[in-house]
Structure formats: structure tokens, C-alpha cells
């Protein structure tokens, strides 16, 4: 599902996470993120309070928008999020956040997102095509 183009954009760009519950949408930019070896998306929880409330209320549904601002290559990813409070992924985010904030903030956990759909958002003939 994650071809090399999608993976490259995910690894080089900021992500916007979108969730919704009770008809109230929420979107947040995330900087602490990576693609796992098995093709899932991992996001460090530093300030994801509303996001977590929404995924708990909606069965884990989440969408990610990612794009290259220079080339306009972009993708919308829909999936299901699971929240982790310990383990290797959480430890990785704790180290990242500790380094960036010099101890003033910490990662409380991590979202691990299993992909269900990847949709092209790049302008052109492939726009809206599911990969």
C-alpha cells in the first residue's frame, strides 16, 4: 500500500492528522512521526489530547494528509489508530521529544496507524485515485 513515492513524501514532510467525534472535526500537525518497518505510521503523543478522545469515541478512525509543498505531490491516508503507552516505539518518541525540548516535554505514548486506504491528492489525472 505504501509505494516508494508515498513513503518518500511521508518521510520528508509534516503530517496533518484528522479525527472526528460527535460531529466535531479536529486536525493537528505532527512533527514526531515515522513509517514503521511493516508499513504502519507511528505518531508520538505530546499534545494529542483531542485526537485521543476522538479515536476512543470513533473506534480508532483517523485520516492523515501529507504533501510536498514544492511539487504538490500529496496523499490522503485513512486508517485505524491504536494507542500504545510502552514499548520500543514509545521509547523512540520519548527520546526524540526529550532531545528537542531538553526535558521540558515528554511523549506520553504513541499512535500506531494501520493503513486502510491511500488516495492520491496530487493535482492531475491521478487525483482521487486509490493506490
Q: What are the language-model segments listed below?
A:
Residues 1-131:
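Binding-site signature for planar aromatic cofactors or substrates
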Amino acid at each position: 500500500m505504501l509505494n516508494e513515492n508515498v513513503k518518500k513524501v511521508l518521510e520528508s514532510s509534516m503530517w496533518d492528522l484528522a479525527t472526528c467525534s460527535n460531529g466535531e472535526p479536529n486536525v493537528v500537525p505532527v512533527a514526531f512521526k515515522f513509517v514503521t518497518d511493516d508499513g504502519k505510521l507511528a505518531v508520538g503523543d505530546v499534545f494529542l489530547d483531542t485526537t485521543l478522545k476522538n479515536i476512543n469515541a470513533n473506534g480508532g478512525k483517523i485520516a492523515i494528509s501529507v504533501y510536498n509543498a514544492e511539487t504538490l505531490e500529496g496523499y490522503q491516508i485513512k486508517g485505524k489508530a491504536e494507542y500504545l503507552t510502552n514499548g520500543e516505539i514509545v521509547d523512540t518518541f520519548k527520546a526524540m521529544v526529550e532531545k528537542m525540548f531538553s526535558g521540558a516535554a515528554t511523549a506520553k505514548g504513541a499512535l500506531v496507524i494501520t493503513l486502510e486506504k491511500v488516495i492520491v491528492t496530487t493535482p492531475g489525472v491521478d487525483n482521487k485515485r486509490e493506490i
